[in-house]
Amino acid sequence: MSPRTAKKTRSVAPSRIREGLPFPLGANWDGLGVNFALFSANATKVELCLFDSSGEHELERIELPEYTDEIYHGYLPDAHPGLVYGYRVHGPYEPENGHRFNPNKLLIDPYAKQLVGSLKWSEALFGYTIGHPDGDLSFDERDSAPFVPKCKVIDPAFTWGRDQRVQIPWERTILYEAHTRGISMRHPAVPEEHRGTFAGLANDELLKHIKDLGVSSIELLPIHAFVNDQHLLQKGLNNYWGYNSIAFFAPHPKYLASGKIAEFKEMVAHLHDAGLELILDVVYNHTAEGNELGPTLSMRGIDNASYYRLMPDDKRYYINDSGTGNTLDLSHPCVLQLVTDSLRYWAGEMHVDGFRFDLATILGRYHEGYSERHSFLVACRQDPLLRQVKLIAEPWDCGPGGYQVGNFAPGWAEWNDRFRDTVRAFWKGDEGQLADFAARMTASGDLFNNRGRRPYASVNFVTAHDGFTLRDLVSYNDKHNEDNDENNQDGTDNNLSWNCGVEGPTDDPGINALRMRQMRNFFATLLLAQGTPMIVAGDEFSRTQHGNNNAYCQDSEIGWINWDLDQDGAELLAFVKRLTRLRLAYPVLRRSRFLVGDYNEAIGVKDVTWLAPDGNEMSVEQWEDPHGRCLGMLMDGRAQVSGIARPGAEATLLLIVNAYHDTVPFQLPSVPEGDYWSCLVDTDRPQMRKPQHLAFDTLFEVKGRSVLLMALQRDEE
């Protein structure tokens, strides 16, 4: 099929534009003009479309005059920041061969640094004619420009002053997952005009709460510009979480209270001043263009066959390892460049401290499957800038062989859903969890202890943005997603939750007390385990989503954090702060080497000893007992050989967990004469003001469903 053309064109004097350069890609101002460069291996012509400042009126179309190494490029002298533009790309419309060029569709520059306006759903957005008997093989000639966000040339200048990366060591890292809108929309100290924006997140009172909590790094859900799905808007909902990116360099316009890119940089500077890192959740596995029936917004119309993974036997259709309709092809060098350029932009220009990669297995896929030696994964480790920031993988996707927990290369940390599921099942009271629970408490060495990887490679979590909040985890057996208007069919049914006896809110004081204790148990397990803990914003004071375990579309009070704390919330917050302080005070809780049970002959101790309630080491039979629910974890910091002496590094700690519903007498290990056990944490007694001192060889009554942390201390008398 021959290339189709745009229905309307404008002739422009060719002398206006110069040849420019093929690099860097995107629209870049050099102080005298703007250079435009766009990759397309299969296009026949590219038109640059200029708009007024509102983006509503197309003023001019200019053909990019040069084509060098698959890059269309041109230079507009006297152009300056604030210029609003888009592209129309000509080429064959042959879906069966993977080509979907349609110059009637205005396209977003994949390298755009800022967008103007928002997407307005219309049939004109689609490259084919909706309702046509040929479906997506038909060709639509309507102009999509009135309905598409436009790109804006920016001036990147910003005075950072003395800002620099906080560079918190992994061993001291505690992640805090939050949503830009959700965290500030209901915060009383945030001005109304700043709520739900980067300026709101930079609020001093909000940052004080985060800093006082004891976390080190804020992990923001996606902030790249994204599209609200049409079916959600029709229901009065929207794509709240933002896992539907359309521009990898541009922040979502709604998050800019000022409308200026500098607002993001100002937020980063405020976070760094507070000693906090910023980690971005990034979605490079797919785009908002969907499958073959989706709209033509950007990459599909620029070079569909290069950007996306297509079915090898019928390139009309997309490989869908993301579960969203399409999958980006990072085996293509220019797609790989797009993603790594985006990462370098956010890390370098915007001073971001790290990234969490959504469905990261996709980013390591060749056509034959996942490889930890994929060019993208290797590039991140070798890049002189990216190797300095934190890299966190969500190590799975929806494709064959997509579950890759523990299989990412050294240099990467990974979300560990094995920790989540095992810890939930253990405190729920499921049988046969004890041995697996012990493995998760030691940073899942069975998964990560290889090739010099460290315990912090395991990112431990009990809850995350997708799923129940911590309060809902102990309050609901089943999901309650009716507000999503999908007949409660969305969201997982495998929650491993326990409502403690009643579904949802109750006035029963016994059940409410048990729920509070269970939340303390979860927090104690998370923050006293080896590895890197992640807390979800609001869990620290018992936030609820009323049983909704899939609030992806709830830009409402369901998805926003309520900062009006009740007494239970305030008490839980104080308890969590105490745990984070203890974690930082005792390096043995955040070791740089795995606990493996090795015996140190020089000092006569093991790095970890697993104790049964009778005080003896766990036997094989006890490990295999499906009814076992009580365990002691004796950690001796002296057994870790490290060239650096750190305060508290040689401490000896005893962690006892009891998931039985009844009290279990536990024989505490004997101690040298003059020493004693000091109880630092007891989830059954959260208001314990002073450490409880326990005498030699004490038989301690460990209450049902509780966690104890004890430290070995010398009597000062």
Predicted regions, residues:
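Short catalytic/ligand-binding loop motif for oxyanion handling, primarily in non-cytosolic enzymes
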Residues: 94-98, 184-186, 226-230, 286-289, ...
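Conserved alpha/beta catalytic core and glycan-binding cleft of carbohydrate-active enzymes
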Residues: 351, 366, 372-537, 541-542, ...
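Carbohydrate-interacting/catalytic domains
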Residues: 1-176, 181, 198, 210, ...
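Conserved, mostly hydrophobic/aromatic
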Residues: 38, 87, 178, 220, ...
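Core domains of carbohydrate- and sulfate-ester-processing enzymes
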Residues: 89-159, 230-238, 244, 274, ...
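Hydrophobic faces of well-ordered beta-strands that scaffold small-molecule active sites
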Residues: 174-176, 218, 278-280, 355, ...
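Substrate-binding/active-site clefts of carbohydrate-active enzymes
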Residues: 144, 179-352, 359-385, 402, ...
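Short, flexible loop/turn elements at secondary-structure junctions
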Residues: 40, 66-68, 78-80, 91, ...
